């Protein structure tokens, strides 16, 4: 007893050292020079007021005689028989079978278990106690504020410690947002338990007449302690819960954290978190597991089996639904030529990178040296119907095809073009991230994705090196477009510069969505026109119109000389924030199709007629025209005829001719398509024959 009374406690690890030790035996910290208030004087003995003052020294918070009324201790005999709760240390009456504060079950004391010394010694003090001693728990709270409790092992560390000295767990301030949500809850339980112990260490009179909380924060913390203590049930269960959460976090990978952040982003309306998960290649149809729901710790928002789509519907995130629903629909098995032949695809990418050059002169824009147009092979029609259906399911985007054909007559609305002139357009499937525009442009030309961002780099470099040229066109076009809708306003030059800087930044960020200006620049890089067939309005998940899309129209390389460009355009489709390549199927190339069209081509050339009017026979808009080039429809039609090979069909439809040749096509692209098609040709023997005559025909062949 005497030796324990003269030991000194380390201010870092609270270990009790012998008085002759100048350093802590456990953590090697130097012995403090001043007095430190600890709980040790209250343990294992019955102190008097004089000894407490000698050992503790001056308290950190000591109210004067006017702060608290001087009262004598009462009910000492009754309080001495109270039992202390094992969870919150609250002193309950002997007849209580549950804790009044946290409702935890009273634990039966074993014969070998000794009573708690932290409270019994103080409860046996018979005489009156000074108010400074009575409210000394405030001093202890001050000391506790200088420490932080480890959420993994519940060890109390010094405030200066960056990590737990026992388990090396980092401080809560260094953890991620999702980890903080869990550790805050754990630390709140521990802090409330500590505060309850400090209250139990006070005098019997203070225990008997506890004053109500002095602030709203204290009452909120008490209410939270009651709820959490009732949920945990016991300290052992709480420690097991912390251990389980730590195991779950250790198993988490980067993709898992991105998925959880995306779920939180849907709930909080943060689209960037969802886009970050999409860009990383995450599965949009992924469901929340029980461990992930436990880690998120928000039962009101998350449930097992929920996907990002479920959360978007529940919290009415219409903008996210428009993107996510397209994503989920595309998780069917896809098999495009670029996926079947990775070696050839890499060679094609190297060919594209080698064909990118920069024009010398004032307009130093980048351009491609090769003219390549991708078309579906005509050999597809030789496959059995079941194999054809499988092929189209794996190479086409059925949702985009349906939206452009059935929901709105945007493509293939002319029976003359689709049937008699063999100019039916097919929407190819591609990635649905922010690179879909660049992917669709390369698919319409070379049949592959812009996986290495070769086209994006050329786009950004062209915008940077030719910024003055494109900026003047963009500014003039935006001003005219706003005035055409009756929006008469003027912007300061600083505002125009800020908007232009944002357009430049989008071009340099892989995965960032692109705008009309980028399509205009891509037309200059390809040196050929780009025709976009797209929906006219943005719509919500419920079908409500939100605004104009402004993407549909013709984009001409107006800043090049006409002699430097090709007149064969490519076609793209736009639906709900997504671009798709629109390609045709090879045809025989004969027959003078189209009134007034003198093709004069051999049988190897495929001619696709792309309409320059919509289903209402209105001329498509030509984007980024200057004030001198703007005019009525006749003047714009004349401009289109100058930049493209145009003709009028017998049905009176103004069309542009897209010409492609298998012999003139790049050999690597032809080889890639043939290898892809061979995979479907091998499926043919597995199909059932309809009758015996077909079997005989196959044998004759």
UniProtKB/Swiss-Prot annotation:
UniProt entry keywords in alphabetical sequence: ANK repeat, Cytoplasm, Hydrolase, Metal-binding, Nucleus, Protease, Repeat, Thiol protease, Ubl conjugation pathway, Wnt signaling pathway, Zinc, Zinc-finger
OTU domain ranges (all copies): 425-585
Classification via InterPro entries: AnkUBD, OTU_Deubiquitinase, OTU_dom, Znf_RanBP2, Znf_RanBP2_sf, ZRANB1_OTU
Binding site for Zn(2+) 2: 85, 88, 99, 102
Catalysed reactions, semicolon-separated: Thiol-dependent hydrolysis of ester, thioester, amide, peptide and isopeptide bonds formed by the C-terminal Gly of ubiquitin (a 76-residue protein attached to proteins as an intracellular targeting signal)
Biological process according to GO: cell migration; cytoskeleton organization; positive regulation of Wnt signaling pathway; protein deubiquitination involved in ubiquitin-dependent protein catabolic process; protein K29-linked deubiquitination; protein K33-linked deubiquitination; protein K63-linked deubiquitination; regulation of cell morphogenesis
Keyword set includes Transmembrane: no
Zinc finger (RanBP2-type): 3-33, 79-108, 143-173
ANK repeat ranges per the UniProt record: 253-283, 306-333
One term of GO molecular function: K63-linked polyubiquitin modification-dependent protein binding
Biased composition regions of type Polar residues, renumbered to the chain: 108-121, 202-214
Chief location of this protein within or outside the cell: cytoplasm
GO cellular component: cytoplasm; nucleus
Protein family membership: Belongs to the peptidase C64 family.
PANTHER family: UBIQUITIN THIOESTERASE, UBIQUITIN THIOESTERASE ZRANB1
Stated name of the protein: Ubiquitin thioesterase zranb1-B
């Amino acid at each position: 007893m005497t030796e324990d009374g003269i030991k000194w406690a380390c201010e870092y690890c609270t270990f009790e050292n012998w008085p002759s030790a100048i350093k802590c035996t456990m953590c090697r910290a130097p012995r403090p020079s001043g007095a430190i208030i600890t709980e040790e004087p209250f343990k294992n003995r019955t102190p008097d007021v004089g000894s407490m003052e000698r050992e503790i020294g001056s308290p950190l918070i000591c109210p004067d005689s006017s702060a608290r009324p001087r009262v004598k201790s009462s009910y000492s005999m009754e309080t001495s028989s109270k039992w202390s709760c094992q969870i919150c240390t609250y002193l309950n009456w002997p007849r209580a079978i549950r804790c009044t504060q946290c409702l935890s079950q009273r634990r039966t004391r074993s014969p070998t278990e000794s009573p708690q010394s932290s409270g019994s010694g103080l409860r046996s003090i018979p005489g009156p106690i000074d108010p400074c001693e009575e409210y000394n728990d405030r001093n202890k709270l001050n000391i506790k504020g200088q420490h932080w409790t480890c959420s993994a092992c519940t060890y109390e560390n010094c405030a200066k410690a960056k990590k737990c000295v026992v388990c090396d767990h980092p401080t809560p301030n260094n953890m991620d947002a999702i980890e903080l949500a869990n550790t805050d809850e754990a630390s709140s339980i521990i802090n409330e338990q500590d505060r309850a112990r400090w209250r139990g260490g006070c005098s019997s009179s203070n225990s008997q007449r506890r004053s109500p909380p002095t602030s709203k924060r204290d009452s909120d913390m008490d209410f939270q302690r009651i709820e959490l203590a009732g949920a945990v049930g016991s300290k052992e269960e709480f420690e097991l819960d912390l251990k389980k959460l730590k195991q779950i976090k250790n198993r988490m990978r980067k993709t898992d954290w991105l998925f959880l952040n995306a779920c939180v982003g849907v709930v909080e309306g943060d689209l960037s978190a969802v886009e970050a998960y999409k860009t990383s290649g995450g599965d949009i149809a992924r469901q929340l597991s029980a461990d992930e729901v436990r880690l998120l710790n928000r039962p009101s928002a998350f449930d097992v089996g929920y996907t990002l789509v479920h959360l978007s519907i529940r919290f009415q995130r219409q903008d996210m639904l428009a993107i996510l629903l397209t994503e989920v629909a595309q998780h069917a098995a896809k098999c495009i030529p670029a996926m079947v032949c990775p070696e050839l695809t890499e060679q094609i990418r190297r060919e594209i990178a080698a064909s990118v050059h920069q024009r010398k002169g004032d307009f130093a824009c980048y351009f491609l040296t090769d003219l390549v147009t991708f078309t579906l092979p005509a050999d597809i029609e030789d496959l059995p119907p079941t194999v054809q259906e499988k092929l189209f399911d794996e190479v086409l985007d059925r949702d985009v095809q349906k939206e452009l054909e059935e929901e709105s007559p945007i493509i293939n609305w002319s029976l003359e073009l689709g049937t008699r002139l063999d100019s039916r357009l097919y929407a190819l499937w591609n990635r649905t991230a922010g690179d879909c525009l660049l992917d669709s442009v390369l698919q319409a030309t070379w049949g592959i994705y812009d996986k290495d961002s070769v086209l994006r780099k050329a786009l950004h470099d062209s915008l940077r090196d030719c910024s003055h040229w494109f900026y003047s066109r963009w500014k003039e076009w935006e001003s005219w477009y706003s005035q055409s809708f009756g929006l008469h306003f003027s912007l300061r030059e600083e505002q125009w510069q800020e908007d232009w800087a944002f357009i430049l930044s989008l071009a340099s960020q892989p995965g960032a969505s692109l705008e009309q200006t980028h399509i205009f620049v891509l037309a200059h890089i390809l040196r050929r026109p780009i025709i976009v067939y797209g929906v006219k309005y943005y719509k919500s998940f419920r079908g409500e119109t939100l605004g104009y899309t402004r993407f549909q129209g013709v984009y001409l390389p107006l800043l090049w000389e006409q002699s430097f460009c090709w007149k064969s355009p490519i076609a793209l489709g736009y639906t709900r924030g997504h671009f798709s390549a629109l390609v045709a199927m090879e045809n025989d190339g004969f027959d003078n199709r189209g009134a007034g069209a003198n093709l004069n081509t051999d049988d190897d050339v495929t001619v696709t007629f792309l309409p320059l009017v919509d289903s209402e026979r209105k001329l498509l808009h030509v984007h980024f025209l200057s004030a001198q080039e703007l005019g009525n429809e006749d003047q714009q039609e004349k401009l289109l005829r100058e930049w493209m090979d145009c003709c009028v069909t017998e049905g009176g439809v103004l069309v542009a001719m897209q010409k492609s040749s298998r012999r003139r096509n790049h050999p690597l692209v032809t080889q890639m398509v043939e290898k892809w098609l061979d995979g479907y040709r091998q499926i043919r023997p597995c199909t059932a024959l309809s009758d015996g005559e077909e079997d005989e025909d196959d044998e004759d062949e």
